[in-house]
Regions:
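Charge-dense, helix-prone N-terminal extensions
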Residues: 1-149
Length: 149
C-alpha cells in the first residue's frame, strides 16, 4: 500500500452507492457497518491498489496504519468495495497478532478470507450477526480517529 497510490476523495458516498452495479448489496453492508459503529466517518477512496488494479473503496473510520517498512499512513478501519465478481470488506484491525477477518473466518458464512480481506458474492452469503460482532470488536481494538473538522 503506497500512500501515494490510494487517496481519499471528496466524492459523495451516497451517489457512489446509488450508481454502483449492485446498490442494494452495498446499502445492506453500509447499513450494517454504520449500525455496528454509530457515527463512524465514511469517505470514498480511489486509486491503484495492491496488484495494480484501479479501485474505489468506501472507507469507514480514519486510522493511522503502521507499516512494516516506512512511515505509518492514513487509512480506514473498514473498507467496502464492489469488485467485478464479488464484494469485499477489508477489516484493518488485529487482535492477538491476527487480523480479525482470520479470527472470525469460520463463522462468517460462505466467504473467502485473506489477511485483512473478506470476499463474497452477496450479503446473503455473509452471516450479518457475526459481521456485527466483528465490527464491534474492530472498533474496540483499533478505535477510529476523531472525525476530521
Amino acid at each position: 500500500m503506497d500512500e501515494q497510490s490510494v487517496r481519499r476523495t471528496d466524492e459523495d458516498v451516497e451517489a457512489f452507492i446509488a450508481n454502483s452495479a449492485d446498490p442494494g448489496a452495498l446499502r445492506t453492508l453500509d447499513a450494517a457497518i454504520r449500525s455496528a459503529i454509530p457515527g463512524i466517518s465514511r469517505t470514498l477512496w480511489r486509486g491503484v491498489f495492491w496488484g495494480g488494479t484501479e479501485q474505489a473503496i468506501i472507507g469507514y473510520g480514519d486510522i493511522t496504519q503502521p507499516r512494516p517498512r516506512g512511515p505509518a499512513v492514513e487509512w480506514f478501519l473498514i473498507g467496502l468495495a464492489q469488485q467485478q465478481r464479488h464484494l469485499s470488506l477489508n477489516i484493518n484491525a488485529a487482535d492477538e497478532g491476527r487480523y480479525l477477518s482470520q479470527h472470525y473466518a469460520e463463522r462468517l458464512g460462505r466467504v473467502k478470507v485473506g489477511a485483512a480481506s473478506i470476499a463474497f458474492r452477496s450479503p446473503d452469503l455473509l452471516d450479518l450477526g457475526v459481521l456485527d460482532e466483528m465490527l464491534h470488536h474492530a472498533a474496540r481494538v483499533q478505535p477510529p480517529d476523531q472525525p476530521r473538522g
